[in-house]
Amino acid sequence: MDNDRQKALDTVIKNMEKSFGKGAVMKLGDNKARKVSSVSSGSVTLDNALGVGGYPKGRIVEIYGPESSGKTTVALHAIAEVQKNGGVAAFIDAEHALDPVYAEALGVDIQNLYLSQPDHGEQGLEIAEAFVRSGAVDIVVVDSVAALTPKAEIEGEMGDTHVGLQARLMSQALRKLSGAISKSNTTAVFINQIREKVGVMFGNPEVTPGGRALKFYSSVRLEVRRAEQLKQGQEIVGNRTKIKVVKNKVAPPFRVAEVDIMYGKGISKEGELIDLGAEHEIVNKSGAWYSYNGERMGQGKENVKLYLKENPAIREEIDQKLREKLGIFDGDVEEKEAESPATLFDEEE
């Protein structure tokens, strides 16, 4: 570019920075923020599937799936990890159904968790926005989008129709929130439910409530589904759960993480260390016996889980070796966008 044109451009940029503040316009090569840092999901398997070592900071994440599939459990594990690293977490409980005893069992510091149980959707989203704009909160979880009922619907009569009201509410809220989330470096997690669209003859009839806006604004979308029941004898003690990365703007998508969610305990970290450790030859498996560094840990997965619980130093050592081998670390991955082809039909906005 010749000098006259460069001077004209520099003058325009200076004027813009005077009007809108420093950093309003920059060269992409100078933008350090294009590298994405992350917060751990609390699961090595899921961190690996997400590709950047966890949920990206300054981004929107949607977790959806059928009832009792483990959506809230997955979100609570992320809160526990943030708090463990000295961060601040907020939980917008629109469903009014958070179990503090269960949250504490998952490792959440309930004494220092900021909780809001809003009366209507507008209030819940305004509280979420206030937390984000403060710049002091590391993660905000909204549980759930389907429960963010517009004020007009709550104050109306039973049977009144409110076509597209919730979708418009979400669309407006996300337009306001997205910029603030990016600037504050807050991770915003929206939990969503699933509905079935009437009259769909071909394809998937499942839809997520709240319109299309959340799908567009989300950098990561996770689909959580139960795969099978886990039993000890005749007693059902948990579920094998599949978490599919349906959309990922910060790493390759379509990866699947399989975890054991145990009733009352959450994701079994010992279970995933055994599975991943054996797969990557950090843990040796011979028949039903598992060993580490030549020392036998036990026969059968449940016995080895118990061994790892009783030996936290060995558990942490295996965890560290796995993270090094899988290259799980904070951020520094450039954006790549791709999404699973139309896994969900959309509600009308």
From Swiss-Prot:
GO terms for biological process: DNA recombination; DNA repair; SOS response. ATP binds at G65, P66, E67, S68, S69, G70, K71, T72. Its main location: cytoplasm. It comes from the Bacteria. This is Protein RecA. SUPFAM superfamilies: P-loop containing nucleoside triphosphate hydrolases, RecA protein, C-terminal domain. It is found in: Cytoplasm.
